Amino acid sequence: MSDLLVLLPVRHRRENAIQCAASFAATARDAELLIISDADDPSYDGIDWPQGVRTRVMDEWMPYVPKINKVALEVAAGYKALFAIGDDCVFQTPSWDRIMMGALEDMGGTGIVYPENHRRRDVPEQWMTSTDITLALGWFANPVLKHYWTDNTWAEIGRRAGCLKFCPDAVIEHRHYSVHKPTEYDAIYQQCEQFGPHDERAFQAWRASQMHADVTTVKKLLDAKGAGYKLTMKRDRG
C-alpha cells in the first residue's frame, strides 16, 4: 500500500479526468489516485482506468470542500499524506510523488508541500498535507469554505507554523483557463465561481477568529513530534 493518496474530485469533465489519470499513471511511482465522482453524474461510466487509479462514487453531490473532506477523513489513517488536485491538472515530472514525499520527509514527516503548477507559487493551489495534520485539525480543506481560498488557508497555517514547503522540482501543471488558452471557460468553472464571494467572506472570518487556534494545533503537533524524535535519537545513541 502506498504512503500517498491523491484525491481528485470530478464533475462532468470526462476527458479531463481521463487525461489527468493517464498523466498520473505515466509519472507516479508509488502514489495512488482516488477519483471521486457523484451518483447523478454518469460521465465517468465505462472508463478503463489505469493501474493505481481507484474510484469512489458519492451518494449525493456536494461542493468541493465538503466532498474532499468527507473522503479525506475516511481514508487519512491509512496514509502518511493526502494530496488534493483538480481535473484541470496534468502531472509532468517523472517520480513527482517521490520528490514531494522526500520533501515531506526532510521536514520530519509533518507539513504541507506543494508543487510547481505554472500558475501560482505564493499559495498551494494543489496541496499535499501529512495526515497527522489532517487528523489533528479534523479537516483536510478548511470546512468553512465551499470551493475557494483553501490554498490561502494552508499558506497561512503553513507559514505561521513553519511547515510549508514549495517543491519546484515536481511539476504538476494547472491548466486553468486563466493561464492555459486552450482550456474552455466551461459551465463547471462558472458554477464554482459562484462560491467565490461566500468563500472570501468565510476565509476572512476564519482568519480573524479561528486561524490562531488552528495554527496552535499544528504547532503543538510539530513540537510533540520534535520532542519524540529527539527522545528516539537519544535512546538510539545510548
Q: What do these predicted regions represent?
A:
Residues 19-31:
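Short, acidic, metal-binding catalytic loop of nucleotide-sugar glycosyltransferases
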Residues 79-90:
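Short beta-strand-to-loop acidic/aromatic patch adjacent to the donor-nucleotide binding site
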